[in-house]
């Protein structure tokens, strides 16, 4: 499979080409076609295997097709959230132009509020800061129909389960979930039964 073979919007194909992504990695060729069908995904992938692109391509395709839809990507650390946003921005170029917001601790709240006011439809962040914005009523997740839990094993190890569950109360029941984890211990399998269809 090549990226050009994917059944995606032409704008996005062009954007992948411009970003010089050529041949899909195993995680990309396995998960992208499933995600594009709107199905939930449980993916095992280490950092550096191209998993970010594996969820970014179907996400942008979905948001291009549905102008009301939103995507939420939850990451365990601000460093990972920043890296994820860098990949998102490589594809979400000026031509595509979907509003986005990076919600992480240690960064200016004002800047984040400005990003959210500009009708951000791609939200990348850490559980703590996402919950801060929910409490402040600056983040409305009622249109989220694409949810990514990235490095889920790390999030559980760091004790984020209650925070994630709190966030998910604000996400509509009907949404697509992609759960990525480096390993698949018992607790991940449990959480996948809970969150995935």
Locations of the language-model features?
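Conserved pre-motif I regulatory segment
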Residues: 1-44, 150
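Conserved nucleic-acid-binding Ia/Ib motif block in the N-terminal RecA-like helicase ATPase lobe
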Residues: 11-14, 18-21, 67-135, 143-146, ...
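Walker A/P-loop NTP-binding motif
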Residues: 29-41, 51-66, 82, 86-92, ...
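Post-DEXD/H (motif II) to motif III coupling segment of the RecA-like Helicase ATP-binding lobe
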Residues: 85, 140-197
């Amino acid at each position: 499979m090549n990226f050009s073979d994917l059944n995606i919007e032409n704008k996005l194909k062009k954007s992948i080409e411009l970003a010089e992504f050529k041949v899909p990695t195993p995680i990309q060729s396995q998960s992208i076609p499933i995600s594009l069908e709107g199905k939930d995904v449980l993916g095992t992938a280490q950092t550096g295997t191209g998993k970010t692109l594996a969820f970014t391509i179907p996400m942008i395709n979905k948001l291009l097709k549905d102008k009301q839809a939103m995507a939420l990507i939850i990451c365990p650390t601000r460093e990972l959230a920043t890296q994820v946003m860098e990949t998102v921005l490589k594809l979400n170029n000026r031509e595509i132009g979907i509003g986005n917001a990076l919600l992480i601790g240690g960064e200016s709240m004002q800047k984040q509020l400005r990003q959210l006011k500009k009708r951000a439809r791609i939200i990348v962040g850490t559980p703590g800061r996402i919950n801060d914005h929910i409490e402040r009523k600056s983040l409305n997740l009622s249109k989220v129909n694409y949810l990514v839990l990235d490095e889920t094993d790390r999030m559980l190890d760091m004790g984020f389960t209650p925070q994630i569950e709190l966030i998910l109360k604000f996400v509509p029941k009907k949404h697509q979930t992609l759960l990525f984890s480096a390993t698949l211990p018992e607790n991940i399998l449990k959480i996948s039964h809970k969150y995935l269809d």
